[in-house]
A protein has these predicted regions:
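RNA pseudouridine synthases
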Residues: 1-261
Length: 261
């Protein structure tokens, strides 16, 4: 258990790919219950421990997970997540389809910032995606398969009407580092949809390493996928001070080699 931030109202952990945030059909103990027991023993609390779940992170995904230690913080954080006031940044490892990568140090000092392309990905079929872009798709979730499907345009139902279950999904990605075989992307979400990063990136040919569900050729040794919730930034719901929480990357050879120091 790696607690990376804690105060009187908020607790954040760096989740591993083996941990679940909330109870599911597996029957495995969720992080919320593990943390309650830890706090009760550590702080010698006589009664029940309050710990509210503010958001979820897929089981095979690693990184920052926020919990609320008070009902006031839970109510406010839930509202902040709903209104997009909690800004989360993800890192993920995908195949390096670009070859030699332009130096980040050179790009930092360009006098004119480059505006990322906004892509409707029908234009990307059989082409190499740009190193930085905004993606927009329509996602449809299949509950039985527990996966989502991406479409360039909003799909229609059998009557020819826009499919009600289709949700617009938007994100920004940028290549920030490479090795010979892999690239590290930084991803920021404009919307929060089911498996959004996994689905949208795989749709343009950038399947996350180890993500068999979305087309990766093989699993990772630890059973997880190379998608990491790197950073959460928000205004503290009680103190109103800015908070930035950063989760260290997983302790494996590839992450340690590719992630910027």
């Amino acid at each position: 258990m790696n607690i990376i931030y804690e105060d009187n109202h908020i607790l954040a952990v760096s989740k591993t790919c083996h941990e679940i945030v909330q109870a599911d059909k597996t029957g495995d103990e969720p992080l919320s219950e593990t943390l309650k027991r830890l706090i009760k023993e550590r702080d010698q609390k006589p009664g029940n421990v309050f710990l509210g779940v503010t958001h979820r992170l897929d089981r095979p995904t690693t990184g920052v997970v926020l919990f609320a230690k008070t009902s006031k913080a839970l109510e406010r954080l839930n509202r902040m997540f709903a209104t997009g006031e909690v800004h989360k940044t993800y890192w993920c490892i995908v195949p390096n389809v670009w070859g030699e990568f332009e130096s980040l140090k050179v790009r930092e000092f360009e006098s004119t910032p480059q505006t990322p392309q906004t892509l409707q990905t029908s234009a990307l079929r059989n082409q190499t995606p740009p190193q930085e872009a905004d993606l927009t798709h329509w996602l449809v979730r299949n509950e039985k398969q527990n996966r989502s499907y991406a479409y360039d345009e909003r799909p229609l139902d059998r009557q020819g009407n826009p499919l009600k279950d289709a949700k617009e999904a938007r994100l920004h990605y940028e290549v920030i580092a490479t090795t010979e075989r892999y690239a590290l992307l930084e991803v920021k979400l404009y919307t929060g949809r089911h498996h959004q990063i996994r689905c949208q990136l795989s749709y343009i040919g950038l399947t996350i390493k180890g993500d068999l569900k979305y087309g990766a050729p093989r699993s990772n040794p630890d059973g997880g996928i190379s998608l990491h919730s790197r950073r959460a930034e928000f205004i503290h719901p009680v103190s109103k001070e800015p908070v930035t929480i950063v989760a260290p990357v997983p302790d494996d050879t590839l992450w340690q080699a590719i992630a910027p120091v």
